[in-house]
Amino acid sequence: MKIHCFLFALFIFLSSLYMQAEGTAGKWSERYNFTAITMDEGLPHNFVDDILKDSQGFLWIATRGEGIARYDGYEFTAFHMGNTRIKLRSNFINKLCEDNFKRIWAVSEMGIDILDIQTMQTVQVTDMKDKLISLCNRPSHLILHSKAGNIWVCSENNLFKITFDKQGDIKQIIKTCEVPAGESIRTICEVEDYLWINYKDGIYRIKESAMEVQEPTFISSALQLPGVSIQVICRKENEIWIGSAQGLFRYNMDTELMKHYMYDPNDNSSLSQNFITDIAETGEHTMLVATLKGINLYNALTDNFERINKDTGEGE
C-alpha cells in the first residue's frame, strides 16, 4: 500500500495553484504559488491516500482513518462510518474515481461505496444481474475510470471491468485478469488502447476492450524490473514514468530506452528520496514526483529536479 505523506500538498498544487509568478528567473518553483491545507483548516485527517478533482471542480480527499472529505475551496464536507445520514463502509479509503454519470466510486478494504456528487448521497446503481452487490462487498484497493467510460476495480488478486448503458446502469461486470495468489496490482495506467499494470517482475499490459479473462502481455525487456517494487505508472506523451520504492524510471516508448533516477546525498538536484509515492503532470506539462520527503519538480532542460518540502517551502 502506498504511503502518501506529501500527496495532499501535491494535488492541491496541481488543482489550481500553478499560476505563473512575476519574475520567473531562478528556481523552477518560483513559477508557482503553493499553499497547504491541514487539520487546522478542517481537513479531517492528515494522512491522505488519494485526491480527485471531480467534473464540477470540487476536490474529494480519501483519508486513512476519517473516510472521505469534499473540499469546495472554503470548507470540508465529511463522509465516514459514523455519519448517520451518509454512512460509508470504511474510514480507510484507498482510491477514488468519477464515472460518466457524476458518481464518485470509493474503494476500501471493506468494499466499494458510490456517492452522487449532486445529491451528496450514497447510491445503488441498477444491476440486472446483481453482480455489483457481490463486487461491492469485496475488499478493493485500486480503481480507474478509463477513456471508454468503463470502471476498472482491483479486488484482491483480480481485476474487474464494469461497463454501463446510456442511463448509467450496469451493463456487464467482467473479470478480465487474475494475478497469482499473494500478488496484487498496485497501479494502472491507460496507454492508448491498453492498461499498463505492474505484473510479475515488471510492467505488462492488457487490452481495455477485453470482455473476458486475459493474460497480461509482455511489452519490452526494458520494462522487466526484477526486485523493483513498482508503486505508480504515469504517461507523458511518448514516455512512461515509473515510480518505485527504488527510485524513478523514465521509459521512452519509441526508443525503448530506460533511465533510472535516484537520491544522491551529494547532489541537491537529485530526487529528495527514493520511495516514490505518486507522479503527476501539471497543466504546464511539468512532471511532479512525490516521495516520502517532499515533491520534486522535474526540469526537462537540465534533466534534474528541484525539491519542495515542508521545511523549505520555496525549494532547495
Task: Name what the model sees in each region.
Residues 1-316:
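Carboxylate-rich, polar loop motifs that coordinate divalent cations or form catalytic acidic clusters
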